[in-house]
Amino acid sequence: MAESFVRLEHVFYKYEDTEKYAVKDVSISAQKGEWVALVGHNGSGKSTIAKLLNGLLFPEDGLIKIGHFVLSEKNIWEIRRQVGMVFQNPDNQFVGATVQDDVAFGLENHGVPHDTMVERVESALNEVGMQSYALHEPARLSGGQKQRVAIAGVLALQPDVIILDEATSMLDPRGRAEVMETIRIMREQEDITVISITHDLDEVLFADRVIVMNKGEIHSEGTPKEIFQQADAMREIGLGVPFIIELQEKLVAGGFETGSTVLSEGALLDQLWKLNSNN
């Protein structure tokens, strides 16, 4: 098995104003190109992990490694060159007068030559489907469009890892779907590792692997299907399950045979059709 590209080993962290650990003995790994979702309530430690991964915070104990670099004061800029972050509120991320200016901002800070910058901005906007908005003012975009531009700004820097820190929590369902589809396509094309920090259980279904956080510790880990087959355990910590899982539970409770657990409405319809056709 290939060595993990992102690795946390026995990481501890607590904020200065509290004695309680925000992250307690957490070990997480992610392969190159893998999508890992961290899910949990507010205060579960998931957003603290996002800040630790980008070097915004340093662990009190334990090791964090991105690629070939261990997080330290010496390697902080090497880490940040490899890790891009998309935050919760897109309005807090814009600094340019136009969409293309905003995407170019990070490249300017990195001293990227102008010709290369133009190519990267165009490529990144094309990748997120926003090239036709290049000269628009960011303030005039919808929430979903703003987050796609924020993702383009990160993509232009060509990171190995993108962290989505509650990146869809302020969006309506349409905007959320736009952003998730953008991330899905981006990961397939660029082989980027995605770490999504979320409390949106439907968003978790896009991930290859899910890590459930509770009170600063890892509660459970597995594929989305494995995690949501443990519906009662999720409810015990107050998280619940996605709508598609609830629907299957209600069908079973009503006496319908649904077969194995599936994670999309289309797959459920196909399964119900096949079962009904055989009766």
From Swiss-Prot:
InterPro entries: AAA+_ATPase, ABC_transporter-like_ATP-bd, ABC_transporter-like_CS, ABC_transpr_CbiO/EcfA_su, ECF_ABC_transporter_ATP-bd, EcfA_1, P-loop_NTPase. It is found in: Cell membrane. Transmembrane segments: none annotated. It is an enzyme of class 7 (translocase). It comes from the Bacteria. Keywords: ATP-binding, Cell membrane, Membrane, Nucleotide-binding, Translocase, Transport. Disulfide bonds: none annotated. Residues 6-240 form the ABC transporter domain. ATP binds at residues 40-47. GO terms for molecular function: ATP binding; ATP hydrolysis activity; ATPase-coupled transmembrane transporter activity. One of its GO terms (cellular component) is ATP-binding cassette (ABC) transporter complex. It is a peripheral membrane protein. Its EC number is 7.-.-.-. ATP-binding (A) component of a common energy-coupling factor (ECF) ABC-transporter complex. Unlike classic ABC transporters this ECF transporter provides the energy necessary to transport a number of different substrates. Belongs to the ABC transporter superfamily. Energy-coupling factor EcfA family. NCBIfam families: ECF_ATPase_1 (TIGR04520), PRK13635.1 (NF010156), PRK13648.1 (NF010167). This is Energy-coupling factor transporter ATP-binding protein EcfA1. It comes from Listeria monocytogenes serovar 1/2a (strain ATCC BAA-679 / EGD-e).
